[in-house]
Amino acid sequence: PIISVPYSISNVIGFNFANMTLIVYVVFVIIEMILHTIWQFVDKSANQLGMYLLRDVLQIPVSIIFTRFLNIFSGMIPSVNNNMPVQIMLLIIAVILTGIGAAMSLNMRIIPNPGDGIVQAISDTTKLNKRKGKGVGFCKNCFDITNVTITFIIGLSTGHFLLGLGVGTILAMIGVGRVIAVFNNLFMDKMNKIAFDYVE
């Protein structure tokens, strides 16, 4: 769902999709840095601003690599437009693996892509982070809904209506956040115990 925003903009203005995604991701990183800086001054216990900002900035090289691969592979992925069962199966697998991957990288504080990083930043800097990992899943759902709404508005205002939106986008909007929430509920304490020797 996050990628639907740069996709719709790139189609409307005729700009390269991967480059538009990079621009949107850099905007996300800037927002993350602002959120973490404000959080530092509001919550005095949040005393690792330098580490948070470093993780935020390092998302830009990750974005550059990701969007270059997006350019390379977007034309190489085979189409399954005429095979609905295969489409549904691939969608379900993609939603589950995306949710698990996002949860694991965010929980372990590995440098995420900015789409996940901004969700983590919102969760970190709000009361949602008190919900034992469930806040990230809820934030993901809210952020995905916001992006789908923005995409819908872009399409509607430019006469393209459902540009960048489909059944897969809607199911991913709901599913990825729920997978993160379920995964964190089942495994977050175990991961924290193994990696950081603490349990929330």
Segments predicted by a language model, with ranges:
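Core subunits and conserved enzymes of cellular information-processing
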Residues: 1-200
